């Protein structure tokens, strides 16, 4: 039999400041880059309390599964000059921990959001001589690794979804709990906004987005309501959309399954930012960028993301021997081994301390050595 590879055993073992805005993609070196805390989350819109952007900058965000991420990636980072890619930098909470724990580590931090790069740059200023920050979507990882590390690295971390920093900034329009412009762009310089999707997509396209990206069973009904409403007045704010969703979704369904806007907001955000398209390209590129014994860890927060990661990891850990042969051919074994048994979740203690960790699903693999 040719098994997929799983192993729990392997789990042990000239300075210049960038001028904003950057063009995308752009590779920029930040010589002096500090802030405070961070985290990334995909609770699709429920912001705890309204607050200004300034308040958000001062409010701590707790990195999800921080200790476990360090535990999983540490064996790949022990050599002097090892390189880690934080493919979803956010405010830099995970990166700060790795840079602190591994004094010889070099970091490449990726984010499409210029605000995130600014905040992370300030936070990581004490490590300025060891970091490279790159403004790009995470599917730009291959170019970033080629330009900053010669094409291969020792470990990569993805923390998918919208970041807490983005979610808590009311003016970004990610939250359905407060009225704000219908924006939802992770990169404020991008062209497409949620308002444009709502006001320009035809009814069939809207239903597809809601069904595929929000798994919304009332997708067709909601799309019809949107088209009728925008014929009178175009959508401009999140509050207008939430009000429509209360009208479009039948009352019995509104009483179960969470906030009635949750799935629609998730779907619009994914469409605006091409999140799943980017992820489908990013995971194979990340696997390809690892050196032998390099490790990749991915945190997903909803089933659509996790399904993509699970499928890619299953293929990577499968035998390369042609089907039908009774034994594995030499040199045709799996290219990667799994470091987690399925998807790991946050424990009750972490969820109590950081409720936004509740939906996380963590998967990790290691590249087999000797190639």
Swiss-Prot record:
Keywords: Cytoplasm, Methyltransferase, rRNA processing, S-adenosyl-L-methionine, Transferase. SUPFAM superfamilies: Putative methyltransferase TM0872, insert domain (SSF81799), S-adenosyl-L-methionine-dependent methyltransferases (SSF53335). It catalyses: cytidine(1402) in 16S rRNA + S-adenosyl-L-methionine = N(4)-methylcytidine(1402) in 16S rRNA + S-adenosyl-L-homocysteine + H(+). Its EC number is 2.1.1.199. Its main location: cytoplasm. Gene3D superfamilies: Putative methyltransferase TM0872, insert domain, Vaccinia Virus protein VP39. Signal peptide: none annotated. It is found in: Cytoplasm. It comes from the Bacteria. The keyword Transferase applies. The keyword Thylakoid does not apply. GO terms for cellular component: cytoplasm. S-adenosyl-L-methionine binds at residues 92-94, 111, 138, 159, 166. GO terms for molecular function: rRNA (cytosine-N4-)-methyltransferase activity. InterPro entries: RsmH, SAM-dep_MeTrfase_MraW_recog, SAM-dependent_MTases_sf. It holds the Pfam family Methyltransf_5. GO terms for biological process: rRNA base methylation. Specifically methylates the N4 position of cytidine in position 1402 (C1402) of 16S rRNA. NCBIfam families: 16S rRNA (cytosine(1402)-N(4))-methyltransferase RsmH. Belongs to the methyltransferase superfamily. RsmH family. This is Ribosomal RNA small subunit methyltransferase H. The lineage of its organism: Bacteria, Bacillati, Actinomycetota, Actinomycetes, Mycobacteriales.
